[in-house]
């Protein structure tokens, strides 16, 4: 871990038009079907390559509803800075564990989403994280705020090519679900088998709110992944559906945690794990 590079610069600035993305980066994401998915079934897409966002776009009709979907650096320095600073690293603090502390020190990239009160985003937003450099770490930060009575489905995808040296993924996800709001957070992680995946995810749910986690974990050499829901308001609810597959040479420790912090809260956990060839 001492040799992990904490920042690898992309060879391009972030683009809002897919045609402007450099060909070698575009080719990687096109093989994964990202542009096609954006055209047919997504309200917005963010694409991160190593430590930086290389593409970010949201449909005009979604933006006109007041939905904010932008990269974290722009959110922290632009007109949404006060909102971001109020929530940034408040659910996951640097004191939680050493990888949260590392994340807080070196984070880069990630997405910021805000859904205004009463707005329902009918089709999903997606961010895709590609770690392409050998011996590098990826430390993106995702911050989502779904205001009172609003709803959103957010999809996170992660992958990396295989190298003979270790890579590290120590991202952070903070989700705020307002009163009577609903958020579904879906993750597919198919890292290569040289990856150490030590991601921290946490949601805070207010009165009558719902958080739904959907998780598929299929790659990496080592994964430790336990999304946490803090049910902070009366009647708040958490649902977790997850599947994990560990093959030869893989050690995947996955599950979820729920803190029932208010009356009449409820949680449902449905997980399945498959081991093959000693995984």
List PLM regions with ranges.
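Short, Gly/Pro- and small/polar-rich lid/capping loops
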Residues: 1-45
């Amino acid at each position: 871990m001492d040799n992990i590079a904490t920042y690898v610069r992309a060879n391009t600035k972030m683009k809002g038009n897919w045609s402007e993305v450099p060909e070698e980066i575009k080719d990687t994401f096109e093989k994964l079907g990202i542009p096609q998915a954006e055209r047919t079934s997504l309200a917005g897409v963010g694409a991160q390559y190593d430590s930086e966002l290389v593409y970010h776009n949201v449909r005009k009709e979604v933006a006109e509803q007041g939905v904010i979907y932008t990269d974290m650096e722009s959110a922290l320095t632009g007109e949404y800075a006060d909102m971001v600073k109020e929530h940034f690293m408040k659910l996951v603090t640097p004191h939680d564990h050493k990888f949260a502390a590392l994340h807080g020190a070196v984070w880069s990239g990630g997405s910021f989403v805000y859904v205004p009160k009463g707005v329902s985003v009918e089709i999903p937003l997606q961010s895709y994280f590609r770690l392409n450099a050998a011996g590098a770490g990826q430390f993106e930060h995702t911050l989502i705020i779904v205001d009172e009575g609003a709803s959103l489905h957010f999809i996170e995808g992660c992958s990396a090519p295989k190298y003979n040296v270790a890579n590290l993924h120590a991202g952070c996800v903070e989700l705020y679900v307002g009163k009577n709001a609903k958020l579904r957070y879906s993750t597919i992680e198919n890292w290569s088998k040289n990856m150490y995946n030590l991601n921290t995810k946490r949601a805070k749910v207010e009165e009558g709110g719902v958080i739904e986690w959907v998780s598929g974990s299929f790659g990496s050499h080592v994964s430790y992944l336990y999304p946490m829901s803090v049910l902070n308001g009366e009647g708040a609810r958490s649902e977790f559906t997850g599947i994990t597959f560990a093959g030869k040479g893989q050690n995947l420790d996955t599950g979820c945690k729920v803190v029932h912090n208010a009356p009449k809260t409820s949680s449902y956990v449905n997980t399945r794990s498959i081991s093959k060839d000693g995984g």
